[in-house]
């Protein structure tokens, strides 16, 4: 029997982030309008019929259009979700930006893990202190219970920190998938 489980992680205080998202878009429109007006005023016609150049208008256009671009990028990050899926011992992690753009982050087989457990445990500290370890924190809620997975992939060592719900936790952290030397905690029963 195949075991498939999927979890979508969203922010707990979503109303605040939605308010920030719309505030970013209001500021983005204002910055874009000011930047475009700066573009229109770069070149002007003088009283004698000759063309003139306004460097201040060019600078204003660059600053405000750049600000609009940065606000657009920031607004996409305000609506970030993480998608965790577990299929027969293979764990996949993806990030979804603004409900549209899905980015694959990593995939690992649970049987290939070197260590796993709760963040902050002794095993976590040991893995985090090793040299050359890439630490990935793919969670949204700082107060949530977080778990780490330590594995080697393509010659690089990775320490991934995720926030799992109870169902995902029970499915992954049992003897069927994790051996005793890997799991830093009590086994869960399915």
Feature names for model-found ranges:
Residues 54-80:
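Transmembrane alpha-helices and immediately adjacent membrane-cytoplasm interface residues
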Residues 25-36, 62-70:
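Hydrophobic core of alpha-helical transmembrane segments in multi-pass integral membrane proteins
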Residues 126-185:
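A membrane-cytosol interface segment of integral membrane proteins
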Residues 1-32:
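N-terminal membrane-targeting/pre-transmembrane regions
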Residues 186-190:
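Long, low-complexity intrinsically disordered regions enriched in Ser/Thr, Asp/Glu, Pro/Gly
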């Amino acid at each position: 029997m195949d075991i498939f489980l999927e979890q979508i992680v969203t922010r707990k205080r979503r109303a605040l982030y939605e308010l920030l998202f719309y505030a970013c878009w209001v500021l983005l429109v204002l910055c874009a309008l000011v930047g475009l007006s700066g573009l229109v005023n770069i070149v002007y016609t003088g009283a004698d019929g000759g063309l003139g150049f306004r460097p201040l208008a060019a600078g204003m256009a660059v600053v405000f259009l750049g600000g609009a671009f940065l606000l657009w990028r920031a607004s996409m990050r305000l609506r970030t979700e993480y998608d965790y899926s577990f299929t027969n011992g293979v764990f996949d992690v993806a990030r979804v930006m603004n409900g549209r753009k899905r980015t694959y982050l990593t995939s690992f087989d649970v049987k290939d893990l070197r260590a796993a457990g709760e963040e902050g445990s002794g095993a976590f500290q040991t893995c985090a202190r090793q040299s050359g370890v890439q630490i990935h924190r793919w969670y949204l809620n700082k107060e949530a219970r977080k778990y780490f997975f330590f594995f080697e992939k393509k010659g690089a060592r990775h320490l991934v920190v995720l926030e799992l719900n109870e169902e995902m936790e029970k499915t992954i952290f049992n003897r069927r998938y994790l051996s005793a030397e890997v799991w830093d905690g009590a086994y869960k029963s399915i």
